[in-house]
Amino acid sequence: MRILVDTNVIIDALTSREPWNKSAEEIFLMAANHTIEMYITASSATDIYYLIRKHLHNTEAAKMIMGKLYSLTGILEVTADDCMDALASAISDYEDAVVEKVASRKDMDYIVTRNIKDYQAGGTKIILPDDF
């Protein structure tokens, strides 16, 4: 199974953000055990790095964590077409629309997110971390 994990779920796991961290950490374990293929978008990677560095107040520690994250996840490119197509998406949040376009183009089975309502207008199946 191939899943695209939204930024909020990655941050939940990496910062032990309660009450969501347990289900997010379970997804990481599934990826580590090769039960699933876990992906993030390239644009999410920069957001994740920024948020982790801000949380830790430590650039080197943030880089180390990102390296570990990259060992568990594939990184999906965001194309110009993804960005352009997202402008016409029924998903009102542009960033979420871009993520959904990437997931659709890469044939992801699910987008795993806590932000279900923003993705419902897209064509990719959406699931909460607790339900995954």
List the model feature ranges, each with a label:
Residues E25, Y49-G74:
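Active-site-proximal, substrate-binding regions of enzyme catalytic domains
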Residues S43-S44, M64-A90:
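Acidic catalytic patch
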Residues T7, A80, D96-E100:
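Conserved glycosyltransferase catalytic-site signature
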Residues D6, D47, D96, N115:
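Acidic active-site catalytic centers that drive phospho-/nucleotidyl reactions
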Residues M1-I40, K54-E60, A121, D130:
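Short, well-structured N-terminal submotif of metal-dependent ribonuclease cores
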Residues R2, L72, K101-F132:
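Acidic, PIN/NYN-like endoribonuclease modules and their adjacent C-terminal/linker elements
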